[in-house]
Amino acid sequence: QDSCSTYKRNIKTKAIFCEKVENFFSLVDKKKIILPKFDCFAYGFPCNDFSNVGEHLGFRGKFGPLYSYGVELIDRYHPKWFIAENVGGISSSNEGKAFKKILFDLKHAGKGYNLTVHKYKFEEYGIPQARHRIIIVGIKKELNLKFKVPKPNYKMMTAKEALSNIPFDAYDNELTKN
């Protein structure tokens, strides 16, 4: 709910579906909602059950299986490409079996996708935080394209450095009202 409220406040669009992901397809089918054609689908499924910080439950947890709703969306709507994101710990959850299953399902969704999987260390890309994330880029096989992982720039940056030189008139630089 908080994410939807933030999105509505910052992105002025009526195309916001603010329901539990588990209800998405039943509501789309029931209300005969037709989604506009889209080329890209970006999603991050809950990391709670895959994180090394948590209990590492993977598919045995409440949130682990939620990735499958993204797979179903890809199956139904066949975007040209997709990007999925999760924590680095996903690769070892359930002794690595969960990650293999997720990759298998994403690869075979729709008419099939070529996957590029990479663990990004964002501090190596000039982001002032040590967040390590697995990013999966899938491109329709029929397009005969492959995503190329960008090389790190290794320019480490502090939060102060990142925030201190933003021009006052920069796009989206207005102060928020919370």
Predicted regions mapped to residue ranges:
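SAM cofactor-binding core of SAM-dependent methyltransferases
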Residues: Q1-N23
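Class I S-adenosyl-L-methionine
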Residues: L27-F38, C47-N178
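Redox-cofactor binding/interface segments in oxidoreductases and associated redox assembly factors
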Residues: E19, A42-Y43, A84
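Short, charge-rich amphipathic segments
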Residues: D2-Y7, P36-Y43
